[in-house]
């Protein structure tokens, strides 16, 4: 009985390992393209641009620094989808096209939706940097409901 269990475990591990190796052959997720930068916004300051690069550019620009793990399936599939979606929502490198949601960028940072908590945990931003990013994005891109959100936060105190 014990030999059968050990054999079953080894078979399962072997199948999982084989499946992992086979999915590495799927070409999707490793075409790490960075199209040319066409035009960036007129930044209100170099600090705003630097903070935006740190917090946003790896998903919302054509200047993505692809991490090493973006070459390993199935993580590569998720990273590729994330960048494609991010660029379609807001792309700081293609400012010549309509960026309908740009005015909401500051709000999403203020509400903690962006940058996502799983995004580059080794380079988390301080609260001061996040506040400066929100202020800079408001000045550069405009505002949505940021003031209303701030007023609601003040009411909670």
Name the predicted role of every residue range.
Residues 82-83, 144-157:
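Extracytoplasmic/periplasmic C-terminal soluble domains
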Residues 1-7:
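Short, Lys/Arg-rich N-terminal segment immediately upstream of the first membrane anchor
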Residues 77-122:
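Extracytoplasmic electron-transfer domains, predominantly the class I c-type cytochrome c fold
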Residues 52-64, 114, 133:
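The canonical Cys-X-X-Cys-His
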Residues 31-52:
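Electrostatic cytochrome c docking/interface patches
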Residues 68-74:
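Short cysteine/histidine-rich zinc-coordinating motifs and their immediately flanking basic loops
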Residues 10-27:
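Hydrophobic membrane-insertion alpha-helices, especially the h-region
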Residues 112, 120-148:
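C-terminal capping alpha-helices of c-type cytochrome domains
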């Amino acid at each position: 009985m014990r030999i059968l269990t050990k054999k079953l475990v080894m078979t399962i591990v072997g199948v999982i390992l084989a499946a992992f190796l086979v999915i590495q052959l799927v070409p999707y997720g490793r075409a790490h393209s960075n199209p040319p930068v066409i035009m960036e916004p007129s930044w209100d300051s170099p600090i705003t641009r630097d903070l935006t690069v740190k917090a946003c550019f790896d998903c919302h620009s054509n200047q993505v620094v692809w991490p090493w793990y973006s070459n390993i399936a199935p993580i590569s599939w998720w990273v590729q989808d994330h960048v494609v979606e991010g660029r379609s929502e807001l792309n700081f490198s293609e400012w010549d096209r309509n960026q309908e949601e740009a005015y909401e960028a500051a709000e999403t940072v203020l509400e903690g939706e962006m940058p996502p908590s799983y995004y580059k945990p080794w380079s988390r931003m301080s609260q001061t940097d996040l506040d400066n990013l929100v202020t800079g994005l408001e000045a550069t891109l405009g505002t949505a409901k940021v003031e209303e959100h701030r007023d609601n936060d003040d009411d909670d105190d």
